[in-house]
Amino acid sequence: MVKGSTRMVWIVVALVLVSMLYGGYQYAVFSPYRVSSEKAKDMIQNNNIDVILDVRTDMERSTLGYYPGSIHVPRADLEHRIMADYPNKDTRIIVYCNTGHRARMATDALQEMGYHNARYISSTYASLM
């Protein structure tokens, strides 16, 4: 009986993990503020973006590289720094991270702060190249 109970616990744990991963994916991908990498590239090339914002950690940026000319403000520091660095709420911002999750959170925060031209991509900076 214990063996069957252990197996059931592992099945439940696996289902919870899959559900969490799927939920995280859904969160990163489905938002009115998400733009495709292709659209973001087009916006950048046509000078329709003022700031390319990297919200990854220092270690991620130094290890994995970054988009040339991007501004680095780790997600944890965003609310404290963005208004000081970019007081104009009309600033056109594209946000990126590694998976889209933090970029979405940052974009939601920017929208709440009044930066209504903030958008994000749900892929890495390399997709903008």
PLM feature segments, named:
Residues 2-66:
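Flexible, polar/low-complexity N-terminal or interdomain linker segments that lie immediately upstream
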Residues 50, 66-68, 108, 118:
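Surface-exposed beta-strand edges and their flanking turn/coil or helix-capping segments
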Residues 44, 52, 57-93:
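Extracytoplasmic/periplasmic/luminal assembly and interaction segments
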Residues 79-129:
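Catalytic cysteine-centered active loop of the rhodanese-like fold, especially the PTP/DSP P-loop
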